[in-house]
């Protein structure tokens, strides 16, 4: 799309980069797990990943070139191989299927998603009917619903609340997908609490820190610029939320790479905002900057709302290997 003819090297634009942006701790951990597994099992075992390790085309294609095989079903993995669960988590039934096979399983589920899984299990064990606020069909939602055998009610919007059939309003609890819009989720929670005053739940604590930070920064960024580009894949929930939030204030486009930028959109633009979803590597942001510099004068600046320092450890076996062979 970018091959539209537009180049004005005299035109100066300010490009404001959102901070934080891109990889969250859960995504960084999942990708590190796969890369360490490639080294650890080199020439000894085939490595399969169940579903996309994270929802980003660039990352998936890069890992494929390193020998990783992405599959949709456990039975596609050969006996004696390694199977890695994606950052979005999997259902208990999938884990049970894997246990029946001769597979070495590594769980790359984000610890914050695992936290929601434990909440669902605890509520169910205590006799509560569970509502999950999230998007039907999303891998994370499928994994969370699959933590218990009791049916989980999925609420995607306010209208869904009116259709809920409850057994006992005093034994009702909710959890949320970790990558939702904070603002939209708060409205849904408020309506649930109004309709079911005794409902239990974590408020907005299930929505991960990185999702909240990126949304807060993106909202502010959109107020300052004429257009926002969000680096992220179309199937990335958190990236789509960033596009929606930025779009409230200004033009917003979710792109996989600089190749999707239509330069004609920038004719009358003086300020461009750039951010990235939690699964998007920063190399994609740098490529956008380099591309813009080929067509106009670029003045770079940062918008930093909050600093992040969260990290998650990889599984012990890989951590020991890393410490032994990849000393920092």
From Swiss-Prot:
One biological process term in Gene Ontology: isopentenyl diphosphate biosynthetic process, methylerythritol 4-phosphate pathway
Organism of provenance: Ehrlichia ruminantium (strain Welgevonden)
Active site, renumbered: 140
CDD domains linked to this entry: lytB_ispH
Keyword entries, A-Z: 4Fe-4S, Iron, Iron-sulfur, Isoprene biosynthesis, Metal-binding, Oxidoreductase
One function term, GO molecular function aspect: 4 iron, 4 sulfur cluster binding
Protein name: 4-hydroxy-3-methylbut-2-enyl diphosphate reductase
Binding-site residues, dimethylallyl diphosphate: 55, 88, 138, 236-238, 279
Similarity comment text for this entry: Belongs to the IspH family.
Binding positions (isopentenyl diphosphate): 55, 88, 138, 236-238, 279
């Amino acid at each position: 799309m970018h091959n539209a003819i537009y180049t004005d090297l005299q035109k100066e634009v300010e490009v404001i980069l959102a901070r934080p942006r891109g990889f969250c701790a859960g995504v960084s951990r999942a990708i590190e797990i796969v890369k360490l597994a490639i080294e650890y099992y080199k020439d000894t075992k085939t490595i399969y990943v169940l579903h996309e390790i994270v929802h980003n085309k660039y990352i998936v294609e890069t890992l494929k070139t390193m020998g990783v095989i992405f599959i949709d079903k456990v039975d596609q993995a050969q006996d004696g191989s390694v199977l890695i669960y994606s950052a979005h988590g999997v259902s208990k039934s999938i884990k049970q299927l894997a246990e029946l096979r001769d597979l070495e399983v590594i769980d790359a589920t984000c610890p914050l998603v695992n936290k929601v899984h434990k909440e669902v299990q605890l509520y169910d064990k205590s006799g509560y009917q569970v509502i999950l606020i999230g998007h039907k069909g999303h891998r994370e939602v499928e994994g969370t619903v699959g933590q218990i055998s009791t049916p989980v009610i999925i609420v995607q919007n306010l209208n869904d609340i009116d259709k809920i059939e409850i057994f006992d309003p005093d034994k009702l609890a909710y959890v949320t997908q970790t990558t939702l819009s904070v603002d939209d989720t708060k409205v849904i929670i408020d309506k649930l609490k109004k309709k079911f005053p005794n409902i239990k739940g974590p408020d907005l604590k299930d929505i991960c820190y990185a999702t909240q930070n990126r949304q807060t920064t993106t909202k502010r960024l959109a107020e300052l610029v004429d257009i926002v580009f969000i680096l992220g894949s179309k199937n990335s929930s958190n990236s789509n939320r960033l596009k929606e939030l930025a779009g409230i204030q200004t033009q917003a486009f979710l792109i996989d790479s600089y190749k999707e930028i239509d330069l004609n959109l920038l004719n009358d633009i003086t300020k461009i905002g750039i951010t990235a979803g939690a699964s998007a590597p920063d190399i994609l942001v740098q490529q956008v900057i380099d591309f813009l510099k080929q067509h106009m004068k670029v003045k770079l600046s940062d918008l930093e709302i909050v600093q992040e320092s969260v990290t998650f450890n990889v599984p012990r076996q890989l951590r020991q290997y890393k410490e032994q062979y990849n000393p920092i």
